[in-house]
Swiss-Prot record:
This is Serine hydroxymethyltransferase. The modification N6-(pyridoxal phosphate)lysine is found at residue 239. The keyword Amino-acid biosynthesis applies. InterPro entries: PyrdxlP-dep_Trfase, PyrdxlP-dep_Trfase_major, PyrdxlP-dep_Trfase_small, Ser_HO-MeTrfase, Ser_HO-MeTrfase-like, Ser_HO-MeTrfase_PLP_BS, SHMT-like_dom. The lineage of its organism: Bacteria, Pseudomonadati, Pseudomonadota, Alphaproteobacteria, Hyphomicrobiales. GO terms for cellular component: cytosol. It comes from Bartonella henselae (strain ATCC 49882 / DSM 28221 / CCUG 30454 / Houston 1) (Rochalimaea henselae). It is found in: Cytoplasm. Catalyzes the reversible interconversion of serine and glycine with tetrahydrofolate (THF) serving as the one-carbon carrier. This reaction serves as the major source of one-carbon groups required for the biosynthesis of purines, thymidylate, methionine, and other important biomolecules. Also exhibits THF-independent aldolase activity toward beta-hydroxyamino acids, producing glycine and aldehydes, via a retro-aldol mechanism. The record marks 238 as: Plays an important role in substrate specificity. Its cofactor is pyridoxal 5'-phosphate.
Length: 437
């Protein structure tokens, strides 16, 4: 090899990102600064540990490993087998399940795998309506689940925004679905897993629980577990579980476990993302520690505090409060749309998302509400006092926005709140080792 070729190879293995691609480096640096200086209230987001970051950014990204531990289609898998087996065993221990598949690349793909394993195109299934707090993959007409299968939606009661279990039972008996999905992305109350299973058993249907939003709370013991009741449980590994982005499928049924494994590979995916599976394993181990129970309890306490303080400030909370990590704020009485609220709060460095509320008359691009969540800020160390202050900051901005004639009329309030946000976030630094990079 020539000296020039040798130098090129050395640079390939040793030059850092800032040297190789300054545009991407700057964008990542900008995102780090955004996360450091903004209050993250998006309920589906969290902040992972340095250990999770290191596992995901490791040399495992180089390795192809089609198949499952001990049954790979490639050589050189002795170490990735160790990693995947650790992830499987930790997931089983964490949730008390007999079988676990850790290969799903995303929440959508894990749910698609269940559909592939249990249903045929055109089969009927039931899921929570999107406006009632459901998820796209639970039967939305714009999603594969609603395009390839006959989707029957159930919802919440108009008078209290709680799940209408009588309607669930009535619809199940009327339509005889092969699958019933429980779980959602914007429902703030406890789920009656036992009742869902009774309804499923009565009509001979499978029960799938998608606990993506509450998995960390289940792991921490502050939310009832669906694992003893559901035929299959799916969850993303980020959100309240505080791991990398990805999916996890659990079951206590060996026959269903085999169907799920075949649906993931070779049904939907090829080689698994071993660097992500390693990060999942790390996150599962973190969630098995006693301190995670404290974290989960704090997540719920902080969400309750946020909801109660906003209520005291005159805001309407869907269903009257929360039992988990999230809350939906109905903004109609404030004469503000979800879209305008999201933008105004964003300008003050409080990040949330516009969200439809039950029986919403606005489009999903406008909405009548916002969704707020406590996991990420709780990870930073925010406690109930901080969440009380956050509620007051939100109130300042949105109360004034409702009276303002334009965004410019709200700018002075947003500037004052942005300074308060800066003072608060500076007290809770992220990844201090990165500040010197």
């Amino acid at each position: 090899m020539t000296k020039q070729g040798n130098d090129t190879q050395k640079r390939f293995f040793n030059d850092n990102l800032q040297t190789v691609d300054v545009a991407i480096f700057d964008a990542i640096r900008g995102e780090f600064e955004r996360q450091q200086h903004e209050i993250e209230l998006i309920a589906s987001e969290n902040i992972v540990s340095r250990a999770v970051l290191e596992a995901q950014g490791s040399v495992l990204t180089n390795k192809y490993a089609e198949g499952y531990p001990g049954k790979r289609y490639y050589g050189g898998c002795q170490f990735v087998d160790v990693i995947e087996n650790l992830a499987i065993e930790r997931a089983k221990k964490l949730f008390g399940a007999d079988f676990a598949n850790v290969q799903a690349n995303s929440g959508s793909q894990m749910n698609q795998a269940v559909f592939l394993a249990l249903l045929k195109p055109g089969d009927t299934f039931m899921g929570l309506d999107l406006n009632s707090g459901g998820h796209l993959t639970h039967g939305s007409s714009v999603n594969m689940s609603g395009k390839w299968f006959k989707s029957i939606s159930y919802g919440v009661r108009k008078e209290d925004q709680l799940l209408d279990m009588e309607a669930v039972e009535r619809l199940a008996k009327e339509h005889k679905p092969k699958l019933i999905i429980a779980g959602g992305s914007a429902y703030s109350r406890l789920w009656d897993w036992k009742k869902f299973r009774e309804i499923a058993d009565e009509i001979g249907a499978y029960l799938l629980v998608d606990m993506s939003h509450i998995a960390g709370l289940v792991a921490g013991g502050v939310h009832p577990s669906p694992v003893p009741h559901a035929h299959i449980v799916t969850t993303t590994t980020h959100k309240s579980l505080r791991g990398p982005r990805g999916g996890l499928i659990l079951t206590n049924d060996e026959i269903l476990a085999k169907k799920i494994n075949s649906a993931i590979f070779p049904g939907l995916q090829g080689g698994p993302l071993m660097h992500v599976i390693a990060a999942k394993a790390v996150a599962f181990e973190e969630a098995l520690q006693p301190v995670f129970k404290d974290y989960s309890a704090n997540v719920v306490a902080n969400a309750k505090t946020l909801a109660k303080t906003l209520q005291s400030n005159g805001f309407d909370i869907v269903s009257g409060g929360t039992d988990n990590h999230l809350l939906l704020v109905d903004l109609r009485s404030k004469k503000v749309t979800g879209k305008c609220a999201e933008l105004a709060l964003g300008r003050a460095h409080i990040t949330c998302n516009k969200n439809s509320i039950p029986f919403d008359l606005e489009t999903p691009f406008i909405t009548s509400g916002i969704r707020l969540g406590s996991p990420a800020a709780t990870t930073r160390g925010f406690a109930e006092n901080e969440f009380i202050e956050i509620a007051h900051m939100i109130s300042e901005i949105l109360d004034n926005l409702g009276m303002a004639k334009s965004d410019e009329d709200n700018s002075a309030v947003e500037m004052v709140v942005r300074k308060k946000v800066e003072d608060m976030t500076n007290k809770f630094p992220l990844y201090s080792y990165l500040h010197t990079c």
